Amino acid sequence: MNRREFLTSTATGVGVLLGSTTTRAHGSAAQATRKILIAGGGFNTPFIRYMAELTGKTRPKLLYLPTASADSPSGIISWYRNCAPINVEPSVQESFIASSRQSRSWEEVLLSVDGIVCSGGNTLNQQAIWRAQGIDVVLKQAWDRGIVLGGASAGSLCWFEEGTTDSRPKQLTIVKCLGFLEGSHSPHYDAEKNRRPLYHELIGSGQMKPGWACDNDAGIYFEDNEPKRFVHTRDAAKVYYVSLEGGRVVEKPYDPERIA
């Protein structure tokens, strides 16, 4: 058996073993409600507290996945600071790792928690790393098993089919993402002047599917692809559904409920 055959065989065997273990821990995919909580920007303490409530656990295990920020130390510090006032068990899983210092697989780590928060940063790089490492597949397993997923900016955009990103030089462009949530997404809708006009242009021209736009500090809770609740931590922050009707772009605003 050559090295490639050995690695493939080993990975397949480990995947089957871990799959059976984690299914017992979280229940079958058919029984779980799939949950995603997003924010246009600012996934801070109130959003983390709301995610903790969505898990249904008294002291849930919440994991921070800072791939998009290149495992930024300052982001990790902020994560622990934002979790401090809440009754949660916080942890971090870096993506820039080595086998010499990490003995647990992606499945063992990501499928053992109750919620996963993805950082902001470069969405394009995030998607490339996830696919190279197989993290995208594990996140889908987590979603199917009822582990609450979430994040803001790149951490909200990543769950949709596509959206607008500043991940490339010079200007905002389109990025293709995981596609757990149908349609497109625009974060930072009120915070960056080019976000709204570009989103309207792309949807109006048919280059991008209709979708959800979120101001900073505003967000949406989805169950099984359906928006269940609109929330915010700042009074002026709103959520919008942007679509094409009769050949023109229509922006429908929603007034979120405050969370604290």
Indicate where each model-derived feature is located.
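N-terminal secretory signal peptides
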Residues: M1-N2
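N-terminal export signals
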Residues: E5-A25
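C-terminal and late-domain segments of enzyme folds
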Residues: S28-R59, S69, P73-P85, G115, ...
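General beta-strand structural signal in soluble alpha/beta enzymes
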Residues: I38, V92-Q93, V117-C118, L149-A152, ...
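Short, flexible loop segments at the rims of nucleotide/cofactor-binding pockets, characterized by
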Residues: G40-G42, V92-I97, N125-I129, Y189-D190
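Short internal beta-strands
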Residues: L63-T67
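Portal/gating segments that form or line small-molecule/metal binding sites
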Residues: S69-N125
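Class I SAM-dependent methyltransferase SAM-binding "motif I" and its flanking Rossmann-like core
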Residues: S119-R196
